[in-house]
From Swiss-Prot:
Family as reported in the entry's similarity comment: Belongs to the UPF0210 family.
NCBIfam families xrefs: PRK05313.1
Database matches in HAMAP family: UPF0210
Annotated protein name in UniProt: UPF0210 protein LSEI_0897
Species this chain originates from: Lacticaseibacillus paracasei (strain ATCC 334 / BCRC 17002 / CCUG 31169 / CIP 107868 / KCTC 3260 / NRRL B-441) (Lactobacillus paracasei)
Length: 447
């Protein structure tokens, strides 16, 4: 690298909030399956402890050695619903407790993979896991959960959509923060390093390292330096910046994998914001020339950003994967929080933005009395966007008991502040109750 590029990278870290958002170790648990879920749980704990024993020390050492902040150390595991084996009891709580205990003992921030993949239908084990979510997320601290209810090739499992509307509500009624650990997906990916939706897919290897980078502040400052630039110049600026950001993720991931003696898998190119000043994806869109996020033109600006990040980042990494784009979590983005609190952005506009961004309706707080069917409708709408457009979409919605539109909820830390957003008061009950499946779109048939 040229001296100027090295200086720019140092400035990105020291002044513009550039960091490695996560190093996530994926671990297969398929070899832990026995005929008894308690025995399986014991094997799960033992394998996680063995494979990830040095994850945190190695990540901390790399951070100290190279001066690169590594914010989170995480683990993703095989979808737990696949671990039932021959046990007819279908009580997955021991496995959840084993995962939580391992995460605490290892010092990792979160562990994902309490997951069911039900896009084609639900087995008894998967139904049991979904119904266990309210209790499991309330009795564990670091376990994250996800459910994939649809895909472009399979269509949408509307029975699961209905169930998850009820489950999300029950999860949040115990404690709103519990809902932050649950994501409902369409087209979920197997190598996502970001929580709460990470799980280690069954086509992945035994163990590997994935990294997720973050640099909204870096991109924003680069664009701000060119106030009169054309769209082509803006795209080129974002691509060059994304290359540097992603190169750092590739470097750190390779070093970590070498030291842990495991394969390096992918870099997730996503721009992940935090509530910190200058670490906002929404601010990037505003710097492009929008008075505030939510203004007409917001979706186009986000599409430009998302595509340019991918084009720049893909040249910097051996393999890219995960979600790779720009996250728009309402409560975790300072400028998004401001726009939502002022009523400058609506759920409907957020939904439109999800058609071109990395994932979906993320960290959205709604009134606690929102009906189950309405939440199911939100999930179905978001999943339909993913199904038709062949992209990953998701819903991480938080019904907050006792709160109404205009109230503010403090989640704290990286989870930020959530203004309670207005939600359409129409009734989706009859639609959701129809049951069955919405078939896959015609363009899904590729063979």
């Amino acid at each position: 690298m040229e001296t100027q590029q090295i200086k720019e990278t140092i400035e990105m870290i020291s002044e513009e909030n550039l960091d490695i958002r996560t190093i996530t170790m994926g671990i297969s648990l398929l070899d832990c399956v026995t005929g008894d879920l308690q025995t399986t749980a014991d094997k799960v704990y033992a394998k996680i402890m063995a494979k990830a024993a040095n994850l945190v020390p190695v990540a901390d050492a790399i951070s100290d050695e190279y001066g690169i902040p590594i914010v989170n150390k995480r683990i993703s595991v095989t979808p737990v619903s696949l671990l039932a084996g021959a046990d007819q009891n279908l009580d997955f709580r021991p496995i959840a407790q084993a995962m939580d205990r391992a995460a605490k003992d290892l010092g990792v921030d979160l562990i994902g993979g309490y997951t069911a993949l039900v896009q084609n239908g639900s087995t008894p084990a998967e139904t049991a896991l979904m119904k266990s979510l309210p209790e499991v997320l309330d009795t564990t601290e670091r376990v994250c959960a996800s459910v994939n209810i649809g895909s472009t090739r399979s269509g949408l499992n509307m029975d699961a959509v209905k169930l998850m509307g009820t489950v999300v509500k029950e999860v949040a009624m115990r404690k709103p923060q519990n809902a932050m650990k649950l994501v409902v997906f369409c087209n979920a990916v197997e190598d996502n390093p970001f929580m709460a939706g990470a799980f280690w897919g069954i086509s992945e290897g035994d163990v590997a390292i994935n990294t997720g980078v973050s640099g909204p502040g870096v991109v924003e400052r680069a664009i701000a330096a060119k106030p009169a630039a054309s769209f082509e110049e803006i795209c080129e600026t974002i691509k060059q910046t994304a290359f540097k950001v992603s190169r750092m993720g590739q470097f750190v991931g390779k070093v970590a994998a070498d030291r842990l003696d495991v394969p390096f898998n992918i870099v997730d190119l996503s721009l992940a914001p935090t509530p910190a000043k200058g670490d906002s994806v929404a601010q990037i869109l505003e710097t492009m020339g929008l008075s505030h996020v939510g203004t007409p033109g917001t979706t186009a600006a986000l599409a430009l950003l998302n595509d340019a990040v991918k084009k720049g980042g893909i040249m910097a990494a051996e393999r890219v994967g995960g979600l790779s784009g720009a996250f728009i979590p309402v409560s975790e983005d300072a400028n998004m929080i401001t726009a939502a609190a002022k009523g400058q952005i609506s759920l409907e506009k957020l939904e439109a933005m999800t058609a071109v961004c990395s994932v979906g309706l993320d960290m959205v707080a709604v009134p606690g009395d929102t009906p189950d069917a309405t939440i199911s409708g939100m999930i179905a709408d978001e999943a339909a966007i993913g199904m038709i457009n062949n992209k990953t979409t998701a819903v991480r919605v938080i019904p907050v008991p006792g709160k109404q539109v205009g109230d503010i909820v403090e989640f704290g830390g990286i989870f930020g502040t959530a203004p309670i957003m207005a939600i359409n008061d129409g009734d989706a009950q009859q639609f959701i109750n129809r049951g069955g499946r919405i078939p896959a779109p015609i363009h899904s048939f590729k063979n």
